[in-house]
Amino acid sequence: RDQPRSRGLGDVYKRQQKVLVELKISEDPNKTGYPFKGAKNFISQLQEFKHIQIKGIMCVASKTEDQALVESEFEQMHTLYLELKEQYPDIDTLSMGMSQDYKLAVKHGSNTVRIGRAIFE
């Protein structure tokens, strides 16, 4: 009875899953992700797992009217992305920017944005 489900699960582990690593760039306690300061070491460790392929990094910036803070967070992410891309050729995605800040994110190198409510406005 469980055999087909088990067989399907085995197929998942045979394929390499492409993932983005979410980083916590903001000081906002409501934001999640791996701490930005330890990201390079963490991503280096993840390279050992053959069933995942790190394709890039992502973040959600601070939700604030302080545009300088948001730009600083995006620029830190972009700098890290360029460093990682040089070290790991498979990394090709920098995902940052949502409805409220996607224009700043693109200005600072984002090549993937996550727009929700702005589509309906």
Placement of each model-derived feature along the sequence:
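Single conserved hydrophobic/aromatic residue that forms the stacking wall/gate
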Residues: 1-13
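Active-site loop/helix belt of alpha/beta enzymes
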Residues: 25-119
